[in-house]
């Protein structure tokens, strides 16, 4: 799935660059095209680093895990209450 998304984004960027028939230089892009390329590059980098995760589907921590991580409670102590 990850490689399919990267492939689609790569093809989109390549087709945008090659749409004039030859490789365009950066001075040939309008401001809106530069913003589109920058946002696509940002998405590619995010997907390459952590895989495709739709916005809002990030893993959630339970309240106890969040409190323990904020307080710095050692894992041994937090596991003791579960036994």
From Swiss-Prot:
Pfam families the UniProt entry points to: Pigment_DH (PF06324)
GO terms, biological process: chemical synaptic transmission; neuropeptide signaling pathway; pigment granule transport; response to light stimulus
InterPro entries associated with the record: Pigment_DH
Keywords carried by this UniProt record: Amidation, Cleavage on pair of basic residues, Hormone, Neuropeptide, Neurotransmitter, Secreted, Signal
Alanine amide modified-residue sites: 80
GO molecular function, one term: hormone activity
Transport keyword on record: no
Localization (cell): Secreted
Signal peptide: 1-24
Example of a GO cellular component annotation carried by this entry: extracellular space
Tissue expression per record: Strongly expressed in eyestalk tissue and cerebral ganglia (at protein level).
Chief location: secreted
Protein family membership: Belongs to the arthropod PDH family.
Function (record text): The pigment-dispersing hormone causes the migration of the distal retinal pigment into the proximal end of the pigment chromatophore cells and thus decreases the amount of light entering the retinulas. May also function as a neurotransmitter and/or neuromodulator.
Entry protein name: Pigment-dispersing hormone peptides
Species for this entry: Eurydice pulchra (Speckled sea louse)
């Amino acid at each position: 799935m990850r490689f399919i998304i990267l492939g689609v984004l790569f093809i989109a960027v390549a087709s945008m660059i090659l749409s004039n028939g030859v490789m365009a230089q950066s001075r040939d892009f309008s401001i809106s095209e530069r913003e589109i390329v920058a946002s696509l590059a940002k998405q590619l980098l995010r997907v390459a680093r952590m895989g495709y995760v739709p916005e809002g589907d990030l893993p959630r921590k339970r309240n106890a895990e969040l409190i323990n991580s904020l307080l710095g409670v050692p894992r041994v102590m937090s596991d003791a209450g579960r036994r």
